[in-house]
Regions:
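Short coil/turn linker and secondary-structure boundary residues
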Residues: 22, 42, 88-91, 114, ...
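Charged, low-complexity, helix/coiled-coil-prone segments
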Residues: 1-8, 38-56, 80-97
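Short, contiguous alpha-helical
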Residues: 29-79, 108, 122-173
Length: 173
């Protein structure tokens, strides 16, 4: 499981590198055409806020309930409703990134402390049906990858639609 923990812990830095490529005045930009996006329809700031909310209100709760309850029924969250409720465009990206980093560290520390028997605990999760705790962790990694892909797609659209010619890597100051 060390590899999956390493993957989970790398996410905040991976996301931060992509976010750094978005000009500050374009953090809330959304394209007119979302065709082909691999993620939900979020701005760069929206992706970040969504990752934090899904970590804290989604997966952390799902993990705990799977451990503590007998075959709990886990709800899927409406990402767009969370965006409205939590006013994503008003959030400070530095604060949100710090909160996401902290939440992810907490998630991994909690998971690392579990006995090996915990990984087979089961829950019923939305359209996925029955899943194990191990499966929930894999779904979180999948969700991370979806949003990294969504950010790459958004950077592609920023370049194409606004003719920004953003570099593939931000030069180090």
């Amino acid at each position: 499981r060390m590899t999956i923990f390493t993957t989970l812990l790398a996410m905040p830095d991976q996301f931060e590198r992509l976010l750094a490529q978005v000009p500050a005045d374009q953090l809330d930009w959304e394209p007119a055409n979302w065709a082909g996006t691999p993620a939900e329809h979020f701005s760069a700031r929206g992706h970040l806020c969504h990752l934090l909310d899904i970590e804290t209100q989604g997966y952390q709760l799902r993990f705990r309930r799977t451990l503590e309850e007998s075959l709990p029924l886990l709800a899927s969250l409406d990402g767009y409703q969370l965006a409205r409720d939590n006013q994503y465009p008003l959030q400070d990206t530095a604060v949100q990134l710090d909160r996401f980093r902290t939440a992810r560290l907490q998630s991994v520390a909690w998971l690392k402390a579990l006995p090996s028997s915990a990984w087979a605990r089961r829950a019923r999760y939305g359209d996925y049906g029955e899943v194990t705790l191990d499966g929930l962790v894999r779904l979180l990694v999948s969700h991370d990858h979806q949003h990294l892909a969504g950010m790459q797609w958004l950077l592609m659209r920023l370049n194409a639609d606004l003719e920004l010619a953003l570099p593939l890597e931000r030069a180090k100051a």
